[in-house]
Amino acid sequence: MEITNVNEYEAIAKQKLPKMVYDYYASGAEDQWTLAENRNAFSRILFRPRILIDVTNIDMTTTILGFKISMPIMIAPTAMQKMAHPEGEYATARAASAAGTIMTLSSWATSSVEEVASTGPGIRFFQLYVYKDRNVVAQLVRRAERAGFKAIALTVDTPRLGRREADIKNRFVLPPFLTLKNFEGIDLGKMDKANDSGLSSYVAGQIDRSLSWKDVAWLQTITSLPILVKGVITAEDARLAVQHGAAGIIVSNHGARQLDYVPATIMALEEVVKAAQGRIPVFLDGGVRRGTDVFKALALGAAGVFIGRPVVFSLAAEGEAGVKKVLQMMRDEFELTMALSGCRSLKEISRSHIAADWDGPSSRAVARL
């Protein structure tokens, strides 16, 4: 049976993967209200397509932090991809390069920055948590720089891990044959005592709860790489990110895995975009499963989107070929949405191309009986 959309990959992944692994990737925090809402909120935004526009040629290319990519759809950091497929992050990196887009590598990857770099050329970002031992952070950043990574995506919504009840029930641990490769060959100081199977829980325990804006400033003193602040969902924090020299913002609720009952990212996006005032680009992750979702995010002011779970599920289903297919499907759907909305380039996508549930009656056509 031919796979025709991204959602079908999740069903295949659920069949193929051990329950503990599938649940780790698929679940969210506590009641999982935000997990469902990340998806559902997109359905409360409708299109206002413009017609009789020559859409023979559609240009989806864009420039992110100075790097030209083929489309505004990029790969979000997801941990431990070798649980999904033996090739893990290698496969994802190759698929991203083939699609001409950006891959973000998780610090908690089962392949190291050097291994991912060895797959060949590509524009790659490195996701970073800040640990209690700043020396560990500095070593990770150095390695990412040396491996040719182009930006740091600093995760700021995780002073502690969210309560993911599926993982508690399943007693989630990283399978014994896998390890968090970015922590190999790093002087972990006190962290050395942990064996591999305990390393993932130990590393999680080393995330610094005292992380604050001053650490964003500190990070800029140890690296010249641009820093994207990942996990902003309010105007207040968007303004602070701009003030503290962030190169960009990723509107993210960590795939609904941290604090439940935060808004869907697509609901928080416009507030953040307005607060950033065009001074730095704003990106979105969370719940993007269709090309229509990508268009809606761009219409609300996003410079691009990142996809996470679709990558992991397609990787589990079909390895590198699966990830390539997901990127191609999203690209094709997005191109079709642009054509049917009368937009020939990303700069033509505007707020007037959508009507959201929260818009006032003045901005929405009132149906006459």
Swiss-Prot record:
Pathway: Photosynthesis; photorespiration; glycine from 2-phosphoglycolate: step 2/3
Catalytic activity from the UniProt record: glycolate + O2 = glyoxylate + H2O2; a (2S)-2-hydroxycarboxylate + O2 = a 2-oxocarboxylate + H2O2
Binding site for FMN: 77-79, 106, 127-129, 155, 230, 252, 285-289, 308-309
Residues at the site labelled Involved in determining the substrate specificity of glycolate oxidase: W108
Signal peptide residues on this chain, from the entry's feature table: none
Subunit: Homotetramer.
Protein name (database record): Glycolate oxidase
